[in-house]
């Protein structure tokens, strides 16, 4: 194992072990709808600390697949901008033509427009980092029966879009997506943390960013692999107030929590200190309280700014 200095994190510097062997590091991004904003905050910190520069392959399920593609554009600012634009209207887009045809699903038109704006399909195909996306193949009764892992670089732009739509096709909300004569839905239904396809490639070092608060990854299937796992320190919500919640405040909270959790996780992993580890739950709660307070301040400031601008307009 090599060693590398990281930049300053809160207090002092951290000397960390760098997990870069020949095949590099596998980055695994779980699915979870609106909870995916959490991964944006985590990725920001991991990139700033140099832990992603040796990632050679990325896998994602559902919104994790979207984040994998956004991250591969190598522009964190643009990734944040994309998430600013993914809102309730994007997710719950109603197409009157679909309703007229008795297709009782939300449209994917707004999501496709976001893909076109922020994801360069040619760059995906040219990128040295492979991207694998999990999709769930349906049987004749339209139930998920088999997970498939698609390497995006093997397909043309149109098929890549279909794979991405399939991996994010939540049941009830969206139509199943047909690819090569077969129907597919959300990849998270059968494998929400697609580690296996990367392991099968020979990857033995992983960074996994999940969505389930407090989860401990069971690594028994991969006994010879090393893992850095980052999961939310606080619950990100259930189906309604979590997965389907793309409101601005929810996204802001999750991004900030992702940043805080990543910083603490790295300190625990690479600068082990018994006292810090024992205090970690308390520090996590303090970080949560800080986020809530900061969001209140931001909301109050924005409200005052809007009122001031409104009053100024009355005099103009």
Map each language-model feature to its residues.
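Gly/Ala-rich beta-loop-alpha elbow adjacent to hydrolase catalytic centers
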Residues: 60, 64
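Patatin-like phospholipase
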Residues: 3-59, 69-316
